[in-house]
From Swiss-Prot:
Keywords assigned by UniProt, alphabetized: Ribonucleoprotein, Ribosomal protein, RNA-binding, rRNA-binding
Species in which this protein is naturally found: Cereibacter sphaeroides (strain ATCC 17025 / ATH 2.4.3)
Main function: Forms part of the ribosomal stalk, playing a central role in the interaction of the ribosome with GTP-bound translation factors.
Subunit structure: Part of the ribosomal stalk of the 50S ribosomal subunit. The N-terminus interacts with L11 and the large rRNA to form the base of the stalk. The C-terminus forms an elongated spine to which L12 dimers bind in a sequential fashion forming a multimeric L10(L12)X complex.
MF-aspect GO terms: large ribosomal subunit rRNA binding; structural constituent of ribosome
A GO biological process held by the record: translation
Stated name of the protein: Large ribosomal subunit protein uL10
Family, similarity comment: Belongs to the universal ribosomal protein uL10 family.
Length: 171
């Protein structure tokens, strides 16, 4: 790889570190190509990506970034999983690590916060953006449906009372 290619890789990695909601770093020694392709496919499904890069170039790309201390995690055979959604990459990486013992999560970064393996696990346990939106919508919708039910209930009660009175008069 010549100098121009290295500079291009450093620039690409810098953009990844700036634009990603979360970056998860893991060791992948012993993971087969097929298993790595499976991980890449799972990441693509959630809008994330997986990148293997030279640790030295990644550390250069991290220089001056809020997540610069993540460079301490970049030793050995490392892979970076990242996504704009702050939870998606962590969820996929954590689930994949549970299935594959050779994929070991070292930590990661979420903005300027450096995560240890337990931190990545905590982030993975959080609901995704879509799940949070669904929860908020259901919370907002619940009172509205209760109000609609309360408004409709007296009318049905009055109708029931009137039908009972009619039955009594007819009898």
């Amino acid at each position: 790889m010549d100098r121009a290619q290295k500079e291009k890789v450093v620039e690409e990695l810098g953009q990844i570190f700036e634009s990603s909601g979360v970056v998860v770093v893991a060791h992948y020694a012993g993971v087969t190509v097929a298993q790595m392709q499976e991980l890449r496919a799972q990441m693509r499904d959630v809008g994330g990506s997986v990148r293997v890069a030279k640790n030295r170039l990644a550390k250069i790309a991290l220089a001056g970034k809020p997540s610069e201390k993540m460079g301490d995690l970049l030793t050995g055979m490392t892979v970076m999983a990242y996504s704009e959604d702050p939870v998606a990459a962590a969820k996929v990486a954590e689930a994949y690590a549970k299935k594959n013992d050779k994929f070991v999560i070292l930590g990661g970064a979420m903005g300027d916060t450096i995560l240890d393996p337990a931190g990545v696990k905590t982030v993975a346990a959080m609901p995704s953006r879509e799940e949070l939106i669904a929860q908020i919508v259901s919370c907002i919708g619940a009172p509205a449906s209760s109000i609609a039910g309360a408004i409709g209930a007296p009318a049905s009660n009055i109708a029931g009372i009137l039908s009972t009175l009619e039955e009594r008069e007819a009898a």
